[in-house]
């Protein structure tokens, strides 16, 4: 069995490689923007995957097994085209797990200050300064106000 990599939620080298390939396929580097596998972003993604080890193991097991079945090779030795084929097949067969991957990768990627700055969003928490909110039609909330309290007071 592959040796465990410390600091990554106890993922094996093979599992870490699978997650890295998937994250890079989702969000590759583009212009001045970093890839999801950037050294400042990817550790957070691994932590997020470690929050649900069952789903993460299912993802990695499926992809590692598919690589052997399709190409009689370890996923880590596959070329880019072969890796994409394995991951795309996984995407088609496991939509629930793909949603989990998307949440893990995107939520961590958009926490990065470089990414947020490129979107024109101020880095840091929204309070105490807050974000500007467009004026809206507050009368749309009138039915909610009229309804009154719908919760039990404790």
Regions from the PLM with identified roles:
Residues 2-5, 16-24, 33, 40-154:
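Mature-region segments of soluble proteins
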